[in-house]
Amino acid sequence: MILYYEGTDISDDVDVKKCVYTDVSGGRRDLIDIEFEYSNKWFGWKPEKDDTIRIVHDGLDTGILYANTVLPEQGRYRIIATGAKSAARRAATASYEDKTLGAIMRTCAGECGMDQGLYGISAGTAYPYMIRENETCTAFLDRLLIMEGGRLKCMNGKLRGIGIEYAQGQAATQCIELEATQLQARYQRRDDMKWSGITVMSPFAKASAYDSSVDGDNQPVVTTLPALDGAQAGRWARGLLLNHNRQAEELNMSMEFNAGLTAFARIDIESDTDANGEWVVDETEHDLILLKSTARLFRCITTIR
């Protein structure tokens, strides 16, 4: 394991006792929780909030994360670092008039002192008017991205808006064989939580989206969004339905360390069970001391209309 602190390799200066890396999607921040024995060089590093930490290990590269908490605990130091700087936790209220999604992303990223990027979502998507309601930058951006059919990921110094369909459309990074008797896997399907459709309605516009794989009439109506025309209402309805229904089929797995399990990665599952098929990783946890990996995946869905 190679541990970089502020860009310097300090692997030989510390004795790491615990190192867990959590790689997530859905507006949450990647996280490293690391403990090492007391080092007499520690004070010489002059640790400060938002110092950068990066770990590379056997094919896994966490990218840059930012020190959030530094705690001395029983002769050890514990560091918690996250994928976004501390400024990203500051809540604020703001309004945006005649702005594109790309412009809003740049403004919020600048507020956090980070970079930004959009993948599978148009930066030119226009918002005649949008309000940020006492939200952190990351919470606000994730709310917008959910409506646009994506999610926010804070990774390697960058606020990334990633489209769900974009992630689903990528080539599988690996194929995992799963047997019915495998104790380290749990498959869950909850058809009762799916919506057959959703309607976005405002004083100015109304539009609906539907999931062709769902029977019944479970169709909520959302009246709290500032849709100003039918195209915007329809786009938001589709994004909300996609993000909700994809959570109905979930697969949780534990295995030996697998560096290829990363959030938003496309995975093929080969199995004689109902879990067979195409999935997208939602969250992974890698224990770099015990060399174990766990992952939660959501089924790819292509039935939203």
What are these regions, as identified by a protein language model?
Residues 36-39, 82-86, 162-168, 259, ...:
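Secondary-structure transition/turn motif
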